[in-house]
Amino acid sequence: MVACTPPPRPPPTPPVNPRTLRHLFNFWPPFLATGVHVSHISSDWRHARVELRMRPWNRNYVGTHFGGSLFSMTDPFWMIMVMQCLGRDYIVWDKAAEIEFVKPGKGTVQVQFKLDQAVLDELTEATASGQKVLRWFPMDVVDAQGDVVARLRKQLYVRRKRKAGGSDSQDAAVHP
């Protein structure tokens, strides 16, 4: 009897570096068309700065920033930053999001993402036994004067990857 062996797995895709990802985002059609510009992603994935520039084609009916653009400028960054910092042993997904429009946005607005070691330690500890964690990350979109235009929260699902043959009984969520 001949044993059937599975074909070898392709090598994992090498992780992209922050500088390359920043350039890719700036030419990504959804960001390019809406005026979103990623101005900085730190080399350690702990900080990012994103701007939304007012353009004739991205104004809403009353001449201010379209709310969907304010929301989309914040979309992938927390997930990517946490995923890159925790590494390949973790699953990280966007789970939920909330936005509160505080005042009309005009001109260039920006949002900053800062991920500190304490948050990463908290996530690592909370997922050590294989449980999923649902963690909220707040951020403010501000105008050139520093006034808050919108307050947002993104919820991430974070879980340590199961080893082969693991059970699905570890789905109780921890909410830090």
Regions found by a protein language model. Give the residues of each.
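Residues located in well-ordered beta-strands
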Residues: 37, 98-100, 112-114, 140, ...
